[in-house]
């Protein structure tokens, strides 16, 4: 490229990274809002940890399968269309979830008119579960197309560093929605029903014998705030879907610039091209041992990550004695400081010292995560927040290294022709992890206490490190083959 083309390319590359970062952060707005709303759902409706964990598990499994399906779709079509439509539909699902209690009540009334008696609480759990599973599928329309777009805009030799910066969108999205819901919505919005004896009695019963007067008062003074945790982020997501569609370009060629790697496109026209492409995908993805090893490692990484992210507000309040606002603060620091610094640092280290061999960096990260989990577990309940915040932040620093780098490694191994498909496989493994981090984690916490839950996280971190060690000698990418 000449100087003019280079300047134009650099400008478009930066714009594309920023636009897609904002877009994917907004996917998190309509996904991780659920974590902050969980205590409110328990307080108002008595939904158990097992049920909440089941929501997370089903959502995660469907999301993983959706990432695989939509990875294939994105590799063969317009990535930005897949992403923009997906974000719009996620917003719609969140709006419906925000009024799901009204939907459940309507179903109960309608059934009664037809001579059938249904229990409101049961119908509500089913309604919420179905809506959140649908949202799980729609969420899978986010990362595969964005991964494809990035592999077209970033050279493989720079992918670890620049994609680590891009992956800050995970932490930015989760951190912002945690702040919006945990600092603004839950503590300040909703209806003040503290003078309503029936509401106070219901909340007291739902929270159980260990509930403090302060907790009961807080939830009764902000009754219904949980629904705004879904409605307000959905409004941002609707605007974001329009932005993705109008601003993002799938590849440099769409704006008259040369591709960063001159390889055949995934887009196929003739039967011969289709056969050649399918053979390529079988060899680089489905028949590639490294992709499956990275997928298994992703399973363990996501258990650790989701245990801290999805259960963080509940786990920190119940096992460490923190208020919901302070637990939210720790989760935000886990994301914003630990996660963002970790992703950028480990991405830079990968390109600088490990010759873009991201899998080697991930071994160090998982060993660090295991040590940090053990340290945090050992801190007694009631310990000052400023002591607890350091190991919890370090956990984010370590776990977000492989969270970002495993997908980069898979994209490099599969090349940009099949990057989204490879990341779809990683998505299946990653979100199959919710079998443990979702309903499994909820069951262990409810029946065996938080010590059992912490032990589960520690074992997963150790297994992740061992899995990654098996591919220590692998090449950095599959372009040379």
Roles of regions detected by a PLM:
Residues 2-10, 254-293:
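Juxtamembrane intracellular "pre-TM" segments in multi-pass secondary transporters
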Residues 32, 60-68, 140, 174-175, ...:
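Residue-level signature of mid-helix packing/kink "hotspots" within the transmembrane helices
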Residues 34-38, 181, 288-344, 403, ...:
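Extracytoplasmic gate region of multi-pass secondary transporters
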Residues 76-87, 351-366:
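Cytoplasmic membrane-interface "Motif A"-like loop-to-helix N-cap segments
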Residues 88-121, 367-381:
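C-terminal ends and interior cores of transmembrane alpha-helices
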Residues 131-169:
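Cytoplasmic helix-loop-helix junction between adjacent transmembrane helices
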Residues 166-252:
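Helix-loop-helix hairpin linking two adjacent transmembrane segments in secondary transporters
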Residues 356-406:
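C-terminal transmembrane helical hairpin of 12-TM major facilitator-type secondary transporters
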């Amino acid at each position: 490229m000449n100087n003019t083309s280079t300047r134009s390319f650099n400008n478009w590359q930066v714009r594309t990274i920023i636009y897609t970062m904002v877009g994917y952060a907004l996917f998190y707005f309509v996904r991780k809002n659920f974590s902050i709303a969980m205590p409110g759902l328990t307080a108002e409706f008595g939904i158990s940890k097992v049920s909440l964990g089941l929501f997370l598990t089903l959502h995660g499994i469907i999301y993983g399968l959706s990432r695989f399906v939509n990875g294939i779709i994105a590799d063969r079509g317009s990535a930005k269309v897949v992403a923009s439509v997906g974000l719009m539909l996620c917003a719609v699902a969140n709006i419906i979830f925000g009024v799901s209690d009204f939907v459940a009540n309507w179903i109960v009334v309608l059934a009664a008119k037809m001579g059938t008696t249904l229990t409101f609480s049961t119908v509500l759990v089913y309604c919420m579960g179905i809506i959140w599973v649908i949202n799980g599928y729609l969420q899978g329309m986010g990362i595969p197309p964005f991964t494809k777009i990035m592999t077209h805009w970033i050279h493989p030799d720079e992918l670890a560093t620049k994609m680590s910066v891009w992956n800050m969108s995970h932490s930015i999205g989760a951190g912002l929605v945690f702040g919006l819901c945990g600092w603004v919505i839950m503590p300040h919005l909703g209806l003040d029903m503290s003078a309503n004896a029936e509401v106070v009695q219901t909340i007291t019963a739902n929270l159980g014998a260990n509930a403090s007067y302060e907790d009961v008062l807080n939830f009764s003074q902000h009754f219904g705030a949980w629904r705004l945790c879904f409605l307000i982020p959905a409004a941002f997501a609707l605007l974001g879907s329009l932005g993705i569609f109008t601003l993002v370009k799938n590849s440099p060629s769409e704006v008259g610039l040369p591709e960063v790697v001159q390889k055949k496109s995934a887009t196929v026209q003739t039967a011969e091209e289709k056969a050649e492409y399918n053979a390529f995908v079988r060899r680089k993805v489905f028949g590639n041992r490294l992709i499956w090893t990275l997928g298994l490692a992703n399973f363990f990484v996501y258990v650790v990550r989701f245990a801290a992210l999805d259960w963080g507000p509940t786990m920190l309040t119940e096992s460490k004695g923190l208020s919901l606002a302070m637990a939210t603060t720790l989760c935000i620091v886990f994301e914003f400081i630990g996660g963002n610094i970790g992703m950028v640092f480990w991405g830079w280290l990968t390109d600088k010292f490990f010759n873009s061999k991201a899998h080697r960096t991930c071994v160090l990260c998982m060993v660090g995560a295991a040590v940090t989990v053990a340290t945090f577990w050992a801190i007694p309940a009631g310990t000052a927040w400023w002591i607890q915040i350091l190991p919890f932040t370090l956990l984010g620093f370590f776990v977000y290294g492989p969270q970002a780098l495993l997908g980069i490694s898979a994209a490099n191994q599969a090349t940009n022709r099949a990057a989204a498909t490879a990341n779809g496989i990683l998505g299946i493994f990653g979100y199959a992890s919710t079998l443990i981090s979702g309903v499994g984690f909820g069951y262990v916490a409810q029946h065996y206490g938080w010590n059992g839950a912490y032990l589960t996280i520690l074992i997963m971190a150790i297994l992740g490190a061992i899995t990654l060690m098996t591919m220590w000698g692998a090449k950095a990418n599959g372009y040379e083959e």
